[in-house]
Amino acid sequence: MKICILPGDGIGPEITAEAVRVIEALDLKFEMEEALLGGAAVDATGDPYPEATRKLAREADAVLLGAVGGPKWDTLPREQRPERGLLGIRKDLGLFANLRPAILYPELANASSLKPEVVAGLDILIVRELTGDIYFGQPRGLEVRDGERFGFNTMHYSESEIRRIGRVAFEAARKRNRRLCSVDKMNVLETTQLWRDVMIELAAEYPDVELSHMLVDNAAMQLVRAPKQFDVMVTGNMFGDILSDEASMLTGSIGMLPSASLDANNKGLYEPSHGSAPDIAGQGIANPLATILSVAMMLRYTFNQENGALRIENAVKKVLAQGLRTGDIFEPGTTKVGTKQMGDAVLAAL
C-alpha cells in the first residue's frame, strides 16, 4: 500500500509531518514517499507539478497533501502558480468527487459563530463534482469587443458526469442517514436543469435514500439558518466550492476539517480543507487535526480500513475532551498547545 506525501507550502510541511507520525503509529505497513507540489515545486523546478511528482502520484494508491499557495507566488504567470499544481494533479488522477465533512465536535460548540442550539450535533457531508462546470468549460477568456474589455466562461455538464457524482453521493448517503439534498439553480440555468433531471433518474436506483432538491441561493441561507436539516449534499463544482467553505465555518475552525478527492476506483487525494496559512508558517502553532483526520478518510475510502479510521477519529475526540487546543480553537479554560504537542497527544490517545 503506497502513499505519496506532498507537504506543499506554508504550514503544509509541519502538519503533514504530524499526519505521517500517525500513519506510522497504525502499523499497517504503508510505504510512503515524499515529493514536491505547488510553490515548493516551483522554487525547485519551475513547475508546480513536476514530472517526478506526477510519476509518484500515479503509482501511489493514495496521496496526502498539506497545502499549496501563498503570496510569494501570486505575481507569477497563471500556469506557474502553485494552485495550478493542485488542479493538475486532480485532473491527472481523474479525481472527480470531492467529499468534505463539516462536523462540530461538542467540545468546540462555542467556537461556532452560530448559537450552540443551532449547530450542536452538526454532521454534514458535502459531495462536490470537481472536474467539470464553469471552472473547466471552454470557451473562456478575456477579449476586447466593441471597444471594451469582455470576459466570458462556459458552464456545462454531461449526463455521464452528473450520473457518476450522483452515484458517489447516493452511496455516501446510504452509509449515513439516507438523506440526500441535491443543490442546483434549475430555475435559470439549463445545465442544472439537466443536473436535477439526472438526479431524479438516479433516485430510482436508491429507493432507500430520500432525495430532495434545493436552489443554491436557498441552500446557502439554510446552511446558516438551520444546518442540521442536511445530511449529505451534492452539487456542481462552483456551487460546491462556495457551499463547502460556508459549511466549514459553521464548525468554528476550518483547521478541523478534512477532505477527500476520489477517482472512479476510490484512489484519492486527501488534504485539510484549510489553506497554507503562510502568516504562521514555521512557527509550530498550526492545527494538524484536519490533516490527521484526512488520514482517517484515506483509511476509510481508499484502503477500506474502517477500524483504523475510527481509531484516529476517536483519538482526536479524546484529545479535544482533554482540553488541548491549538490557537485557532483555543478558548479560556482550555490548554493551548503547538503543532507537535497536538500530534504527540493524538499519538498518546491512539
Curated annotation (Swiss-Prot):
It is an enzyme of class 1 (oxidoreductase). The record marks 135, 185 as: Important for catalysis. It is found in: Cytoplasm. Pfam families: Iso_dh. Binds 1 Mg(2+) or Mn(2+) ion per subunit. Its cofactor is Mg(2+); Mn(2+). Keywords: Amino-acid biosynthesis, Branched-chain amino acid biosynthesis, Cytoplasm, Leucine biosynthesis, Magnesium, Manganese, Metal-binding, NAD, Oxidoreductase. GO terms for biological process: L-leucine biosynthetic process. It catalyses: (2R,3S)-3-isopropylmalate + NAD(+) = 4-methyl-2-oxopentanoate + CO2 + NADH. Mg(2+) binds at residues 217, 241, 245. NAD(+) binds at residues 70-83, 275-287. Belongs to the isocitrate and isopropylmalate dehydrogenases family. LeuB type 1 subfamily. NCBIfam families: leuB (TIGR00169). This is 3-isopropylmalate dehydrogenase. It comes from Aromatoleum aromaticum (strain DSM 19018 / LMG 30748 / EbN1).
